[in-house]
């Protein structure tokens, strides 16, 4: 049996694993049992009724959380000319083309959280697939990070846009805020994510789609949430 820290052990005692909590109750409990002294990230795990082994049952996309994630994200934009200026004016942290590709290839530089590119840059950016792909940093049309509307893309990321992608076990993991957020803000962020996942339901998915939701802080225990109360 794995060993838990004393604080986590105490936190586990306060969470009833057999109960499906209302969203607000779940977040109140999460705040109460968060064991760390720092402002932990609140994470959600959503178990979906899909088989990710099939291409027609992939769930991937992005959504702007109404209250953001509490984290300032660093944005790199691959663009030239007017689009490069547009990116800078919108608040991108790094903007470039061949120079940025070379920096990543030669120096292994990865000092950004999100990469955005104009479609005409993807021939060049595609060379970085082996570096950016495994880290989830490759620009992708499905998440709105390959676009000519650079200003909007940058502003959305800065405003709290998150990307989601189902893993091999059929689970979506995503950050939805910080422990310091009010319960109301966490509930609204959770509902926004779940609504986006429902809209992204593959036509090939059969049976129950939302199979389970649990929330946790970075160092805290998982707390099960009543899915019907989230979508009500």
Curated annotation (Swiss-Prot):
One annotated GO biological process: regulation of translation
Keywords, alphabetical: Repressor, Ribonucleoprotein, Ribosomal protein, RNA-binding, rRNA-binding, Translation regulation, tRNA-binding
Pfam families, A to Z: Ribosomal_L1
MF terms in GO: rRNA binding; structural constituent of ribosome; tRNA binding
Lipid metabolism in keyword set: no
GO cellular component: large ribosomal subunit
Known role: Binds directly to 23S rRNA. The L1 stalk is quite mobile in the ribosome, and is involved in E site tRNA release.
Family under the similarity heading: Belongs to the universal ribosomal protein uL1 family.
Oligomeric form and interacting partners: Part of the 50S ribosomal subunit.
Protein name: Large ribosomal subunit protein uL1
Species name: Pelotomaculum thermopropionicum (strain DSM 13744 / JCM 10971 / SI)
Upper lineage: Bacteria, Bacillati, Bacillota, Clostridia, Eubacteriales
Gene for this chain: rplA
């Amino acid at each position: 049996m794995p060993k838990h820290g004393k604080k986590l052990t105490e936190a586990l005692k306060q969470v009833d694993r057999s109960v499906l909590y209302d969203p607000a109750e779940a977040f109140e409990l999460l705040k109460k049992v968060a064991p760390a002294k720092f402002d932990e990230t609140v994470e959600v795990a959503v178990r979906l009724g899909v088989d990710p082994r099939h291409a027609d049952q992939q769930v991937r996309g992005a959504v702007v959380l109404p209250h953001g994630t509490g984290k300032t994200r660093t944005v790199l934009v691959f663009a030239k000319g007017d689009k490069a200026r547009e990116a800078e004016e919108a608040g991108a942290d790094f903007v470039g083309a061949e120079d940025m590709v070379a920096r990543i290839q030669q120096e292994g530089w990865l000092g950004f959280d999100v990469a955005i590119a104009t479609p005409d840059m993807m021939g060049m950016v595609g060379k970085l697939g082996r570096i950016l792909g495994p880290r989830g940093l490759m620009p992708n049309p499905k998440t709105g990070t390959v676009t000519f509307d650079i200003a909007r893309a940058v502003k959305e990321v800065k405003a709290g846009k998150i990307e989601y992608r189902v893993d091999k076990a059929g689970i979506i993991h995503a950050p939805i805020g910080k422990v310091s957020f009010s319960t109301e803000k966490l509930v609204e962020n959770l509902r926004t994510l779940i609504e986006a996942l429902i809209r992204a339901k593959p036509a090939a998915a059969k049976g129950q789609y939302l199979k389970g939701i649990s929330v946790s802080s970075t160092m805290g225990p998982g707390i099960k949430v009543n899915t019907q109360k989230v979508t009500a």
